Amino acid sequence: NVFQEGAASLLGEDDYEFVGPLPPSAFSEEDRILYDLIAKFESAGSYDAVNVLWYPSGKGGGAFEISSDLNATFEGSKISELSFGKIKKLQSTYFTVRYPKTKPANSFFAMGKFQVIPKTMRLVRANMDFSDSDIYSPENQDRIIEFLIYSGKKRKKLSNYLLNVGSTTLDQAQIDLAQEFSSVPQPNGSSYYGNETSHHSSETIRTALKNARDANKKNGRTSY
């Protein structure tokens, strides 16, 4: 697999473990490396990963409890087999009670390979063409990460940097990415979120961002 060989070259053979399928797509090798770097510590690369959060203090930004499952199912179906309508229902608890004090039943907070949270999923549904009956499949999850990284609907500095638009710096793009994914470090190596820990080295992320930007420039890509 050319992409896996490229990732191994970037990170070192023993530092990169692919989990789950890599569905075919039009992603460049450089984009795929970036996306799987993000997924490595968000979900171990599993399209069926979920997190459930609750806050004993009832407030955000402080201590929280988390329950994680890399191969979650609901009513006998894998997460990647559920409809977007079902996903919406499973995440709806967090719109009713954003900071539940106890673990909410039949609810998930972050879902899938890229750990899409309720607020982000709402943005996705408002801007992409998914219906309630469409499936949260590996292919559609990959479409979502492409949207989040490149559309500029949520992280404009990140998309501008990758598409060589304007004067956005690498530091600004990395901070944007760190705001979206807590496992991604800021330029100084720390997580953007004080109550969480980044897992990647800053240099690894910066290399992946620069490589994706250079590939887009070489290929003449300037838009989502």
Where do the PLM segments sit?
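Cell-wall polysaccharide-cleaving catalytic domain and substrate-binding groove, primarily
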Residues: 2-135, 140-224
